[in-house]
Regions:
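Active-site bordering "gate/hinge" segments
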Residues: 1-26, 30, 39-46, 50-71, ...
Length: 311
């Protein structure tokens, strides 16, 4: 099937140019040949227009396609063949009651229920351990349901949604330029990712051309943010298996990364760096040289601790 691709991200597309497929034709698309970026519904009267954004990693191109279904209707679940649709289909069903028939795990994504149907393991030697939603200090509240056999964890199911803020609706009201800070606040450790997506949206719609240097600096901030998240996850894994020295080491290395971000724009999480049409800070040469030294040390330290951790 020929899917019209756009040349790159941050490229405006008129709604009337987005192809609309009949649902049977839509479900026949070989989605396993692409990476699923987005799958969401937009109400149109008593129907919902479902947009799907796909990326082709071999060509670095994006496409956007759509289909239209009535609210409270049904279609054959895409998750059965393409697991990447798993959460997207659950959210679509939760919001619009469009049922993906055959979905293997059709549970609410955000709705909190006293009788939530957690996965269970039956057996005389199994037991459940419930953790949260109030736990662990600074991270988002979540309920973790462990099924265990002795000290062995058989399964873990996580339920979030306790602090759903309705961010999408907040974006619909007020001055669009004031939403930059809101975009930074969608996810605390991904501030640069959120604001880069939002500013990229405004810049592409406004046909604003961003200087090459500014683009490179944004990419650098995104990579620092990504590295900090990955290193933090490695530290969390080490802590979960009681490898305390590893957890401490990863935490110390992560601090070097976020302190480098702070040297660029005054905030360890990159808040305030990305502006609309340009960046709000400029990275001076002497700061860049220090950053290079920091990142070389980070690489050496991560290689050393990971060699021990995964041996």
């Amino acid at each position: 099937m020929n899917i019209p691709f756009q040349s790159a991200n941050c490229f405006p597309v008129h709604k009337k140019d987005i192809p609309v497929y009949e649902i049977g034709q839509f479900c026949g698309i070989p989605f396993d040949q692409f990476r699923l970026c987005a799958f969401f519904g937009v109400p149109e009267g008593d129907s919902v227009k479902i947009y799907t954004v796909l990326s082709d990693e071999n060509s670095d191109k994006l496409s956007i396609i759509s289909t239209i279904l009535k609210k409270d209707s049904e279609y054959s679940s895409l998750t059965v063949k393409f697991p990447q649709f798993h959460l997207f289909e659950r959210e679509l069903y939760e919001n619009y009651k469009i049922k993906p028939v055959g979905h293997p795990w059709l549970k609410p994504v955000r709705k909190i229920s006293a009788n939530y149907p957690f996965f269970k393991c039956n057996g005389s030697e199994t037991h459940e351990v419930a953790v949260g939603p109030v736990h662990a200090g600074v991270i988002e509240p979540g309920h973790f349901r462990f099924n265990c056999a002795g000290e062995n964890i058989l399964s873990l199911e996580i339920m979030h949604g306790y602090q759903k803020r309705g961010v999408e609706k907040l974006f619909l009201n007020g001055d669009i330029f004031s939403k930059r800070s809101l975009a930074e606040s969608i996810c605390g450790d991904s501030a640069v990712a959120g604001v880069s997506a939002y500013t990229g949206l405004l810049e592409s719609l406004g046909n604003l051309k961003i200087e090459k240097t500014a683009q490179v600096q944004r990419a650098l901030m995104l990579e620092l943010e990504r590295a900090a998240v990955h290193i933090g996850d490695l530290g969390a894994i080490a802590g979960d298996i009681a490898y305390i020295s590893g957890a401490d080491f990863y935490g110390a290395v992560r601090t070097i990364v976020i302190n480098t971000s702070q040297s660029f724009g005054g905030n360890r999480f990159g808040r305030g760096f990305v502006g609309i049409g340009s960046n709000r800070f400029s990275i001076e040469n002497h700061i860049a040289e220090k950053a290079v030294k920091n990142l070389r040390k980070v690489k050496d330290d991560i290689d050393a601790i990971s060699s021990a951790f995964f041996s």
